[in-house]
Amino acid sequence: MEQSPRAELEESMQYHHPEKTLAELPGGQEIADEMLAPFFGTDVRTYREIKGAFAERARRCARELLESVRFARFVDRLPFEPGSTVVGLGDSITDDAQSWLEILRHLLAERRPEDGIELLNAGISGDTTSGLLGRFLDLLERDPAWIIILIGTNDVAFVRDPRTKSLVSREETDKNLRTLRDLTEALSEARLVWMTPPPAIEARVVESSSLCEPTWRNADLAEVAKLVRGVAGEDTLVDLWEAFGDPPEPELLLPDGLHPSLAGQRAIAAALVEQLGYRR
């Protein structure tokens, strides 16, 4: 089904954030909405309206989760020290304007506003483990206390025929994941949290992609999830195959079968908080 111009704009703004790239330029720390709106071919008022709607949905998810006294206690027990920096790394699942990390941001704002915990969303749509490795040292310079990694979905993307080369080979994905871990241990005091890429609904993925567009198979995503489990070792591991189910619950994924819906992002945030809060 063809999208309306408004729906296309909202999707573009949901998964693309040019301010992350612009912030790396000299004097680019504060990027005004007046500069960002033209990137999407819209006016400032519409840009702010859509941006605010994403934030409100993430805030609403956080408040709904906090209606559970048990869950609220897990948020209180999250091992993030006051004033610390928590970095979330990954692809569009993290870069999503209403992602698990944005929900986590609102959870902390609701329950622990005085702690001054900084959450840095360093997800980049379309990223792979190779791309993440290329920018990882710059992220370590932010001196994070915690690094949460959810990466690998795009590594196994291929164009229609599964015999074609995936974006990143399994061997390279494994090496990249291990290098991320080794660099963290050697150059940082940060604690690592690993999340497996979630499963997809293959039928939806096939239906929503054209002949020349990348596609995905659950068998390949399962292999990456296995690699993440192997690399995690004694670090905290959040297994999203357990959180989503195998096969995944349909409402947790968008019609494209790959990206988490708002309910899916909420499930990721809940699994992360429960795992970290329980381990403490």
Model-found features: residue ranges?
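Short beta->alpha junction loops
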Residues: 120-128
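Alpha-helical cap/lid subdomain in secreted, periplasmic
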Residues: 2-14, 102, 106, 110, ...
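Catalytic nucleophile-elbow at a beta strand-turn-alpha helix junction centered on a G-D-S/GDSL motif
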Residues: 83-101, 156
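Short glycine-centered, acidic/aromatic-flanked micro-motifs in structured strand/loop junctions
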Residues: 89-91, 121, 151
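Conserved donor-binding loops in enzymes that form glycosidic bonds
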Residues: 91, 124, 258
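N-terminal secretory targeting modules
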Residues: 1-87, 109-115, 141-142, 186, ...
